[in-house]
Regions:
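N-terminal glycine-/charge-rich "phosphate-binding" loop or analogous flexible N-terminal tail
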Residues: 1-47, 51-52, 165, 169, ...
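Rossmann-like adenosine-cofactor binding region
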Residues: 43, 56-61, 174-271
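Phosphate/diphosphate ligand-binding glycine-rich loop within oxidoreductases
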Residues: 45-124, 138
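Phosphate-coordination loops involved in phosphoryl transfer and adenosine-cofactor binding
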Residues: 68, 141-144, 217, 226
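Rossmann-like dinucleotide-binding domain for NAD(H)/NADP(H)
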Residues: 93, 226-322
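Oxidoreductase and adenylate-handling cofactor-binding alpha/beta cores
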Residues: 106-125, 159-166, 296-310
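Glycine-rich NAD(P)-binding loop of Rossmann-like domains
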Residues: 123-156
Length: 322
């Protein structure tokens, strides 16, 4: 079994790692982008554990891994070529954890909102440079938070907002808006009203072929110059180049993000990372010990179940049944 991309060698210290006792495990703490080198590295292994989307599992890679039988991971899998997995006889198992929010992601979203509204990174940098106050922040109480995506993380963030005295309004898919209304939530009348009326907008949507490029240049143009846009979900939910263009145009006035089109980025390869009206973090929304314990307990359970001949959470189950 190979575990990929454990950059800080964290997993061996988790309680759940003991579930792998009796299994020969190799943990890779670096990130390899060269397909030929990665294929050579992974060729001996029967099973892979993925660290979220840190490594893309492409058809080109899978075609060079004749021994591979299992890929175990958690949550959505846009980085895995499922068709190529099936063609190569590789079972993909992924616990979709329905009904369980990522409190780590929700808390990080709220941290970015707070940090941006109160200019915390800028104030800190200014102070460390030997200066005193450098500007005036904004309070959240009485302001409107627009949440795009009526799901588990969005609902958790809504709870934080309500505790801070914010007005919460929703938008999303037709089905999501319907669920929100049935639950007594405030839903914007139109998409344009949603973007126009909110002081802060945060996106909480899974990346699928249908949601790729969901947030457009037109949406950003509807936002006010004093508003904040937050994305801790996936960069590809935004139309390519649209956020940078929007920040340069001043609508929205600010943004806070945890996700990038290419990860990891090599500073300053992504111009968003150095934009003066943006604060950013290196995709750490899920990077807490507590979240790792939760996620990898599920991932390791899938390995054990496969080893026992009774795999769980199968995505391409047809190859197992056939």
């Amino acid at each position: 079994l190979a575990i990929l991309d454990d950059w800080f060698n964290t997993l061996r210290g988790l309680t759940c790692f003991s579930k792998l006792n009796g299994i020969e495990v190799t943990v890779f703490t670096d990130h390899e982008t060269d397909i030929a080198k990665l294929a050579k590295r992974l060729r001996p292994f029967d099973a892979l554990v993925l660290f979220r989307e840190r490594t893309a599992i492409t058809a080109e890679l899978l075609d060079q891994l004749p021994n591979l039988k299992l890929i175990s991971q958690r949550s959505v899998y846009p980085h895995v070529d499922v068709e190529a997995c099936s063609r190569n006889g590789v079972l993909l198992c992924s616990n979709m954890h329905s009904g369980t929010p990522s409190f780590a992601a929700a808390e990080h979203t709220w941290a970015l909102i707070m940090a941006s509204m109160r200019q915390i990174p800028q104030q800190m940098a200014n102070l460390q440079a030997g200066h005193w106050q450098m500007g005036v922040g904004k309070t959240l109480h009485g302001r409107r938070l627009g949440l795009y995506g009526y799901g588990r993380i969005g609902k958790t963030v809504a709870g934080y907002a309500e505790a801070f005295g914010m007005d919460v309004v929703w938008w999303g898919s037709e089905a999501g808006r319907k669920r929100a209304k049935l639950n007594g939530q405030k839903v914007a009348t139109t998409r344009s009203e949603f973007f126009e009326s909110a002081d802060v907008i945060s996106v909480h949507v899974r990346l699928t072929p249908e949601t790729r490029g969901l947030i457009t240049t037109t949406d950003f143009a509807s936002m006010r110059p004093d508003s904040l846009f937050v994305n801790t979900s996936r960069a590809a939910l935004i139309e390519p180049g649209a956020l940078l263009e929007a920040l340069n145009a001043g609508r929205p006035g600010r943004a806070a993000i945890d996700v990038f089109d290419q990860e990891p980025i090599i500073w300053p390869a992504d111009p968003l990372a150095t934009h003066p009206n943006l604060i950013c973090t290196p995709h750490i929304g899920f990077v807490t010990e507590d979240e790792f314990e939760l996620q990898f307990s599920d991932v390791f359970d899938q390995v054990i179940a496969f080893q026992a001949g009774a795999p769980i959470n199968m995505i391409n189950a047809q190859i197992w049944h056939s």
